[in-house]
């Protein structure tokens, strides 16, 4: 952003008084790094710490941020404020030092709320679909020439980054319910894609508590704000009478304000019609597969229509949509002759989905777009608590693929829970008689096990939220050939 653009932005968004140096503890996460990137481009001095370098820390370093790959008290001593990731514990030496030095320590969402305070905020919440919907809204606003600021939990492929500082009054952000920190946000528009039982430790295992928290989030909207909600979701439909704000609904349901109809999928593209009240029909070509992505697009269109964005810009943005990182991310198609001597090819797709509903949506999109391909899934369960709480749902959904290779649970810092491990889940799936899953206890053996499982005209889904994304990239780099991958 040049000096003239920054001056224009400052007329909308004033500087934070007494804040020059902002330190992030856990800066390598997509959400933390995205906020740091926006603030760096606003001219603040940025530093941060994490345990290992990654693409996020590399990008921030190129913007002039000072990144430490250790947690030490001295890292924070010159900071005006310290922003902390939800993954960081209170005994972290940087947090202790900041408190001792009377430096304010705030959560990530509090800083995001500050970025949103003087802007027209659009916050996207929900159990599933937040990241993709955030990217779709961003793409439409960018196509319309509105140059929004955005902060997303995943890579926006068209922009090549998780976040970007725009020159307009618009801020589009993913809102995280996992630790209830989205209650800090006070947007003008809020999307809720769906509500399911997830992150239940945050809500004391009480689903009513989770539902009320979403209501409280929506009541952070001003009385003239807009709630955009998916009426196909049974929980959302139940909650509608309790939302005391203007509501626009969307979905496949007949009573949706923005209604998806005539959906069909050809390869990776969805084709459908959007019906809007008192507006022309939109005939949409969406460059993203699956009925779930048609719903995400409908939410984005509802917001854009309310803002008065031209229909042509909306349609162009959806047809050109490049997606987000690790959301049905096509990595390549490789001949099997060099992999295992078989004829035919195998497509490789990487996907972040780690909840049964998300995995089911990904499987359905794969089946609809490539009905003649055999579906081979490499799945890494994420968290023992989630595996325990949704055990039967996982067993049902994972039984729908043709071949299943399952890695050990990615713990995300949790202690093992008896009966909520990958071996138990494989045993349960095998007992249901549809498929015989392969338990992969040593990740180094996966390329060879995968090569033995491929038969030609396969679609490989690498599925999960842990470190499995790195494995997907290794498989792509090796073109699925086990001798190179090892």
UniProtKB/Swiss-Prot annotation:
InterPro entries: Mur-like_cat_sf, Mur_ligase_C, Mur_ligase_C_dom_sf, Mur_ligase_cen, Mur_ligase_N, MurCDEF_pg_biosynth, UDP-N-AcMur_Ala_ligase_MurC
Family listed: Belongs to the MurCDEF family.
Subcellular location: Cytoplasm
Keyword field contains Cell division: yes
Catalysed reactions, as listed in the record: UDP-N-acetyl-alpha-D-muramate + L-alanine + ATP = UDP-N-acetyl-alpha-D-muramoyl-L-alanine + ADP + phosphate + H(+)
Organism: Pectobacterium carotovorum subsp. carotovorum (strain PC1)
A GO MF term: UDP-N-acetylmuramate-L-alanine ligase activity
Name of the protein described by the UniProt record: UDP-N-acetylmuramate--L-alanine ligase
Pfam family, one: Mur_ligase
